[in-house]
Amino acid sequence: LFLHPSLQMPGKYSVPESLLKFFTRITCMGATAKLALSIRDYGDEPVHGIKVVPPLLRQEAKTIIRHHGDYIMGYMLNAGFAEDVKAWHEKHPHTRLHFFWDQPDAPEELKVDDTLTFHRINDEKFLKMMAGCKAFATTAGFESVCEALYMGKPCMLIPAHVEQECNAMDAEREMAGMVSEDFDIDKLKAFARDYEEDVEFRMWENHAECRIVAAIENAYETYYHRKENQAYEEENDSIVAASSLVVPARRVWQG
């Protein structure tokens, strides 16, 4: 999606954004088609070989029973954000918080007190707790934001690098979440009050499998026909070359 002309980049960091696009182009070199995963249908760009498709979410995220519980859930790519969460929690000890972090040396559950718990990353537990939270705060990873959006959870995005900056800006522009520079849960609670579930995204996502399969099949057909035409043209060229050699030979023999 970073190569789609309609995607607006944040514009904060020109060099990292240029490098992100450059790296994306390198990964696409030689591709017959480029599948751009997006929370919205930006429309295909045939000139650039870009086909826009919904995110490919795990089936469990789409079928799990969900409800709005009494706690706020979060995910931190950078464990350093834990201090922000603790600082906010000290001022609001009655708000229940469950945060997942990438801290391998931490216990499975680090219970700070009755209303704040840090959890080591566990996919099954993460999904179950997301399904039951009332709001979700995260460092703007694309997949987790899309899962929360599908479940109808208000999201606060705290980007930690340029790719997440792009994800966060895109999500905020599409009213899928709000962006913050830190884990200020007050902002998330305010956003959640007026939040309405994004039914349009859910409908878009429900067609992910058929759209992606169709795009792959179309790319294969395009590649196959291209190779077939190339082989046909090479065969014709060889016949023409052979004919040009035969004609002079006949003239010599006739002479």
Model-derived features: positions:
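Active-site-proximal region of nucleotide-activated glycan assembly enzymes
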Residues: L1-V52
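Short loop/helix-cap segments at secondary-structure boundaries that form the rim of catalytic
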Residues: C28-M29, D41-I50, T63-H67, D105-T115, ...
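Hydrophobic/aromatic beta-strand patches that form the interior of the parallel beta-sheet core
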Residues: A33-L35, K51, H98, H119, ...
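Donor-nucleotide binding loops and adjacent catalytic segments primarily
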Residues: L56-G132
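Nucleotide-sugar donor-binding patch of glycosyltransferase catalytic domains
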Residues: L110-K111, P154-E197
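Short acidic active-site motifs
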Residues: E124-K125, K187, R211
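C-terminal amphipathic helix plus adjacent low-complexity
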Residues: A190-G255
